[in-house]
From Swiss-Prot:
Its EC number is 3.4.21.92. This is ATP-dependent Clp protease proteolytic subunit. The active site is at S101 (nucleophile), H126. Signal peptide: none annotated. The lineage of its organism: Eukaryota, Viridiplantae, Streptophyta, Embryophyta, Tracheophyta. It catalyses: Hydrolysis of proteins to small peptides in the presence of ATP and magnesium. alpha-casein is the usual test substrate. In the absence of ATP, only oligopeptides shorter than five residues are hydrolyzed (such as succinyl-Leu-Tyr-|-NHMec, and Leu-Tyr-Leu-|-Tyr-Trp, in which cleavage of the -Tyr-|-Leu- and -Tyr-|-Trp bonds also occurs). Its main location: plastid. It is found in: Plastid, Chloroplast stroma. GO terms for biological process: protein quality control for misfolded or incompletely synthesized proteins. SUPFAM superfamilies: ClpP/crotonase. Component of the chloroplastic Clp protease core complex.
Length: 196
């Protein structure tokens, strides 16, 4: 029988009795957010909503985004990144396992000096992909133009967040580049590696 999402007791300030809430809702109240799946519209919208709500609730307390994601869709990932830049609280990004593709883009998007990877975390960068093989010729050309614009945007963000020259990032995005936590730190995707 599946366990489901664990529940934990929570007591609201000023209340005598605790009640049971799922663990993620309890952690959200502490401003701890989680991306533990591929990036898609649903999780993107949930994280955006949480970041906006928590920043309205208190714009002086930092947010912490824990990540273990193989990447996913480009536009939902860019939407998460843009929201991280938009909200007033600093967003710490913490890579716990894998931050690949859009996951590494979001990881790099944390507040500079507040991006962390666990010692055995892995990071992977590459260029955005598309499903050209399904498109007709006219659609193919339009999609290729859009993909080039997205690649340019992603490259510029990595340049800004890592301090690497444009040509280096552009060349590295040509293929899958896997990095250890210390290599990701040297590259500028994270600022710190947690100690074992």
């Amino acid at each position: 029988m599946p366990i489901g999402v664990p529940k934990v007791p929570f007591r609201s300030p000023g209340e005598e009795d605790a009640y049971w809430v799922d663990i993620y809702n309890r952690l959200y109240r502490e401003r701890l957010l989680f991306l533990g799946q591929p990036v898609a519209s649903e999780i993107s919208n949930q994280l955006i909503g949480l970041m906006v709500y928590l920043s309205i609730e208190d714009d002086t307390k930092d947010l912490y985004l824990f990540m273990n994601s193989p990447g996913g869709w480009v536009l939902p990932g860019i939407a998460i990144y843009d929201t991280m830049q938009f909200v007033r609280p600093d967003v710490h990004t913490i890579c716990m396992g894998l931050a690949a593709s859009m996951g590494s883009f979001i990881l790099a998007g944390g507040e500079i000096t507040k991006r962390l990877a666990f010692p055995h975390a892995r990071v992977m960068i590459h260029q955005p992909a598309s499903s050209f093989y399904e498109a007709q010729t006219g659609e193919f050309v339009l999609e290729a133009e859009e993909l080039l614009k997205l690649r340019e945007t992603i490259t510029r963000v990595y340049v800004q967040k890592t301090g690497k020259p444009f040509w280096v990032v552009s060349e590295d995005l040509e293929r899958d580049v896997f990095m250890s936590a210390t290599e990701a730190q040297a590259y500028g995707i994270v600022d710190l590696v947690a100690v074992e």
